[in-house]
């Protein structure tokens, strides 16, 4: 098989998963670089980079790159492609060629996003792309149009991937295997795919209307022609809120596997509770979107509904957190790097969840909306939730993907540096938000200097951690320490073919005997 047929025309779920992981790692470095530019600008009062426009272009690009080109490709495309077929005993994904197309739509999408920042003054709209700021007056030129096309491509990629994962998870498992006997990671990817399939078309509609408002003189979001900018907010957030659950649900699946494995358990605590908690989170995620819009002026009964509906999500989330703790309980914990990431995830994700409960209160949110309190909240659940889950999964399955082992001491040191860096970066932002520092500004009054400087120092520590990770991965490939024998393979069937597994697995259907 030539290099080109293997890597460009690939129909193999393992190779496509590897492509997604490499793409996500590269995009992650771009996104990290953008975040360091943001923290450098905010490291002290005064201007570093230029005006607020360039600053907001960087903020917008940072969000898009991290969401659409780092977290989603790695979690869904990387871990999802690699593990879902192995975990259900399928020979590959249901639609292997469509799988390849899903991946190859992403590099052009990324290219369009980068192009948007090189024409005119860039798209400095924030990742929400609200009109009228995103309209053709405030953002004349092609920048926002290129960003919209980028989103269209990433969206098509995700929708195709979602169809593929739904079909695979439901239809490609052995007939004797009920859906309630599939591993939790398979469930998490299935639910994530359903969320993508239902939410992305709404985003596509919203940004297409924005495109025609900008270029074809329609007035969907322009009051002068009978439109309403708040309609855009509803369309965007009907996608945007499920999106944040799309980013974290595969992480829930990864953490369930890692916690179970390193606690030495053969199954997670409360499997059915875990499944129904994820289903509940997926359902509730669609009916709370307007909590992002408490400041646009809604009726008191509407605010009351969105406040209480948002708080209800804490219940299934709590079920998951306590089930992870119950899984750990009574286990002989194996203190390998992945469990450190998983424990860090549980602790920090819970803190992020608590600040989320605070923000769910519409009255409090009116004071805190668009302050650094919100930034701190979602970075605790993303920068320490999603990213820690990715690193837990990566350090756990790296031997499966490559056949080599990471250096255990360095991997633990990397956890320590990263843990310090992200907490020092984002914890002070709660204080800034409570003190009223607004988001999306490149400068601030001197009173906010101390916590901003602390936050920026934290970002440099996180950068050190990223460089450490690059070295640790290089060291593993360089030293070529082979995997001897994974433990607990009876209850973790992704490992049964050895490390790494052969190019084709389960070519003939697996024999499944169901325990009565």
Swiss-Prot record:
Pathway: Energy metabolism; oxidative phosphorylation. The keyword Zinc does not apply. InterPro entries: Cyt_c_oxase-like_su1_dom, Cyt_c_oxase-like_su1_sf, Cyt_C_Oxase_1, Cyt_c_Oxase_su1_BS, Cyt_c_oxase_su1_dom. Its EC number is 7.1.1.9. One of its GO terms (cellular component) is respiratory chain complex IV. Its main location: mitochondrion. Residues 42-51, 119-141, 214-228, 288-299, 359-371, 435-447 are mitochondrial intermembrane. Component of the cytochrome c oxidase, the last enzyme in the mitochondrial electron transport chain which drives oxidative phosphorylation. The respiratory chain contains 3 multisubunit complexes succinate dehydrogenase (complex II, CII), ubiquinol-cytochrome c oxidoreductase (cytochrome b-c1 complex, complex III, CIII) and cytochrome c oxidase (complex IV, CIV), that cooperate to transfer electrons derived from NADH and succinate to molecular oxygen, creating an electrochemical gradient over the inner membrane that drives transmembrane transport and the ATP synthase. This is Cytochrome c oxidase subunit 1. It comes from Struthio camelus (Common ostrich). The gene is MT-CO1.
């Amino acid at each position: 098989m030539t290099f080109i047929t293997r890597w460009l025309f690939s129909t193999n779920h393992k190779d496509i998963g590897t492509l997604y992981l490499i793409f996500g790692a590269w995009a992650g470095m771009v996104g990290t670089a953008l975040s360091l530019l943001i923290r450098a600008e905010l490291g002290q009062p005064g201007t570093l980079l230029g005006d607020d426009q360039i600053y907001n272009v960087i903020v917008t690009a940072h969000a898009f790159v991290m969401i659409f080109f780092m977290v989603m490709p790695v979690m869904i495309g990387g871990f999802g492609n690699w593990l879902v077929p192995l975990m259900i005993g399928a020979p590959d994904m249901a639609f292997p060629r469509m799988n390849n197309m899903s991946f190859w739509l992403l590099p052009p999408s990324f290219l369009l996003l980068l192009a948007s920042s090189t024409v005119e003054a860039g798209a400095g709209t924030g990742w929400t792309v609200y009109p009228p700021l995103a309209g053709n007056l405030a953002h004349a030129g092609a920048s926002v149009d290129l960003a919209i096309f980028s989103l269209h491509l990433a969206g098509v990629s995700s929708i195709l991937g979602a169809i593929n994962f739904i079909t695979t998870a439901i239809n490609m498992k052995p007939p004797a295997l009920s859906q309630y006997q599939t591993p939790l990671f398979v469930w998490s990817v299935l639910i994530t795919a359903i969320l993508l399939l239902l939410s992305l078309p709404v985003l596509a509609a919203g940004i297409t209307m924005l495109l025609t408002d900008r270029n074809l003189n329609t007035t969907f979001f322009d009051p002068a022609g009978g439109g309403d900018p708040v309609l855009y907010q509803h369309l965007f957030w009907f996608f945007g809120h499920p999106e944040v659950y799309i980013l974290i649900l595969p992480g829930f699946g990864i953490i369930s596997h890692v916690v179970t494995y390193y606690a030495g358990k053969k199954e997670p605590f409360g499997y059915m509770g875990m499944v129904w908690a994820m289903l509940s989170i997926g359902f509730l995620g669609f009916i709370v979107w307007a909590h992002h819009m408490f400041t646009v002026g809604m009726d008191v009964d509407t605010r009351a509904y969105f406040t209480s509906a948002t708080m209800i999500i804490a219940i299934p989330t709590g079920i998951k957190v306590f089930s992870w703790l119950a899984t750990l309980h009574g286990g002989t914990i194996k203190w390998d790097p992945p469990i450190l990431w998983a424990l860090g995830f549980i602790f920090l994700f819970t803190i992020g969840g608590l600040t989320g409960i605070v923000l769910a209160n519409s009255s409090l949110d009116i004071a805190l909306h668009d302050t650094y309190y919100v930034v701190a909240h979602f970075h605790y659940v993303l920068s320490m939730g999603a990213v820690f889950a990715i690193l837990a999964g990566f350090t756990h399955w790296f031997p499966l993907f490559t056949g080599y082992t990471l250096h255990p001491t360095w991997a633990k040191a990397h956890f320590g540096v990263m843990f310090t860096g992200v907490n020092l970066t984002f914890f002070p932002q709660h204080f800034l938000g409570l003190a009223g520092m607004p988001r999306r500004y490149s400068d601030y009054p001197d009173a906010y200097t101390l916590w901003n400087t602390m936050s920026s120092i934290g970002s440099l520590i996180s950068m050190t951690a990223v460089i450490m990770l690059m070295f640790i991965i290089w060291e593993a490939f360089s030293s070529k320490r082979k995997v001897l024998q994974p433990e607990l393979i009876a209850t973790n069937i992704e490992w049964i073919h050895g490390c790494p597994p052969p190019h084709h697995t389960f070519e003939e259907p697996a024999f499944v005997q169901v325990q009565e």
